[in-house]
Amino acid sequence: MMIPSGECTYAGRKRRKPIQKRRLTMGTEKSNPSKRHRDRLNTELDHLASLLPFSPDIISKLDKLSVLRLSVSYLRVKSFFQALQETCVWSAPALSPEDHSSRGFPVQEGRLLLESLNGFALVVSAEGMIFYASATIVDYLGFHQTDVMHQNIYDYIHVDDRQDFCRQLHWAMDPPQVVFGQSPHADTDNTVLGKLLRAQEGGKGLPSEYSAFLTRCFICRVRCLLDSTSGFLTMQFQGKLKFLFGQKKKTPSGTALPPRLSLFCIVAPVLPSVTEMKMKSAFLKAKHRADIVVTMDSRAKAVTSLCESELHPKLNYLAGRSNGENVISLFRGQTDRSHWTRALARSSCLCLRGGPDLLDPKGTSGDREEDDQKHILRRSPGARGQREMHKYSYGLETPVHLRHLDWSTEQRSQEGTTKLTRQPSKSEPSTCLVPHGSCVPYPGSQGMFSASNMASFRESLDHPTGTYCSQMNRPLPDIHQGQVDPSTCHIPQGSLGSRIPLSGMQCFTARGFSTEDAKLPSLPVNIGTPCNPVLSLEVPIKMENESGSQDIVEASTTSCVWLGTGDMTRRHLVGFPARMHLKTEPDYRQQVCTPHRGHGILGTNPHSRDTVGSCREHAPLYSAHCTCLSPEPPHHLFMCSHSESQHPSLDQDCRAPIVKREPLDSPSWAAPGHVTVPRMFPKNASITVIPSKGSDGIFLP
């Protein structure tokens, strides 16, 4: 049988259920010869169908043509096995007693062998007729055995693979082009096939020189009812060409034809490639995302003045992990207790000046508080996604000496301003007494304070940027993790902004990082952390003086804004818009400032001296997005030397101011979801400070 010509049609499942026959009652009805003939034919077909080796439920679904086709196929298969026994190509092995069951019937090995195959058995004649197909074909192609037996194989092969399949059926893979109805054998084919047939009939087996020509292994696309996407399944045919005995075919003249080579093979499905594999499991169906991101914000690289090659080998080179929408920014780092902790990027955070150490407010309580923090994040309205930043330990710097800062005041009555200049210290590193509530401009800069207590900087800023009011990165220098012990000062629970982490403290390492805007409601106020009440710079504020304080101007009693230096600071000066009043009471010794990387306030014993070895600097570290108000009760920060630690006196005062809100004609407080941070001072905004009573303190460079 050759490849069917004409339109390309494929086989399908078209079994028809036979019509149920009813017995006619003998009566007065007239006899119909044609009807009696059909009845006899149907009876014979039913008897023939019952002889087929199929179950009754399968036989009941067969039509008349299927019964005849399967009967012919069954007879041909039976004739093949009879011919094998006559030619004695192989002798059937004797069955041992173990091969019989307890009932005396032999074990059905054929069924077990078919079930163990990764595929199904198939025999295709030289004409392309399916001589035999095992019952396991239904598991791979969806066609039942009765559907394909004695059918044309080309109805199941893809139209583009039919020519290749026809070549595989020829012993030389070069089938001759013959006219339909004539014998496809040529003289060469007859000679070769005759030689092979005589060798096989004599029991010698196939000659070795022809074995390579008779082995087949190829791939074709086969019609499949189980795959609804394309309708074809790629299958691998692996087997050999063997003679199909017992067919007893004849030429039109009546001459018997010799047996033909047929394909005996096992058909197995080919595994699809990785790109074509279906994503069936839940893990593979998940949205693909980069597990680790090692890119760094360009603004952070500009601040640190480091190129990509310098940042890549650093241990603190940030690795980001994005989950969902970037609504809440989180930072995660490993604490000194060898467990991971998280901190909100937009909330206030205690940090240590001169180093990358952060005070984790929930590290001391372990995983329980970490779970509480996660619960807070899930409760927040804006907590639809999270962004975690991993930070690693960074190198430590050498200890630095404490230097005394000498300041002198020059008053100019005409201009109504006061100029502050710093005098170089001639003594050894020591401590000095500075009233609380005051701060000093950045070293190397001159601060001008007018009679209305407006501060400005005149000299160029030549140091790296510390803290400024923007949403850019903030680099933190290195410092040892154990140089500062947390204080136990009380923090008012209703601080402005209420962006304080949970209670408890732990040190973990951080460096310069970039954060994204996060919408997060108020968080609980931290208790027991130094200088913890934080006023977010997102809220525009204005300070008012009390009456009678306009003429009091001292360098040691004025509040100011701490600014870093460098080009970044000149472009992004910290400012407070004049849209809201912030009224402070002078009795509470307030201090309103923004922290920077070069200054801190240390309370210590006025009689302390520099001991053996150099002392380290200690000061609270603040987030780059907030200003700091000193806490309400006194707290104790101390210096650690190589030989001893000296504690400050208990009379130092560190109180948070009482903030009063007053309505204005202009728009009132910003909305809670307002996250925009101004980068520059409005020209009409002014910062008025109130001098307060002095207290002991020390300023560090």
Swiss-Prot record:
It is found in: Cytoplasm; Nucleus. Residues 12-24 have a biased composition (Basic residues). It holds the Pfam family HLH. It comes from the Eukaryota. Residues 25-78 form the bHLH domain. One of its GO terms (molecular function) is nuclear receptor activity. SUPFAM superfamilies: HLH, helix-loop-helix DNA-binding domain, PYP-like sensor domain (PAS domain). InterPro entries: AHR/AHRR, AHRR_bHLH, bHLH_dom, HLH_DNA-bd_sf, PAS, PAS-like_dom_sf, PAS_fold. Induction: Increased after TCDD exposure in liver. Highly increased after TCDD exposure in kidney, spleen and heart. Up-regulated by 3-MC in small intestine. Keywords: Cytoplasm, DNA-binding, Isopeptide bond, Nucleus, Transcription, Transcription regulation, Ubl conjugation. Highly expressed in testis and weakly expressed in heart and liver. Highly expressed in small intestine and cecum in a male-dominant sexual dimorphic fashion. PROSITE patterns: BHLH, PAS. There is a cross-link at residues 583, 660 (Glycyl lysine isopeptide (Lys-Gly) (interchain with G-Cter in SUMO2)). Residues 555-701 are annotated as: Needed for transcriptional repression. This is Aryl hydrocarbon receptor repressor. The gene is Ahrr.
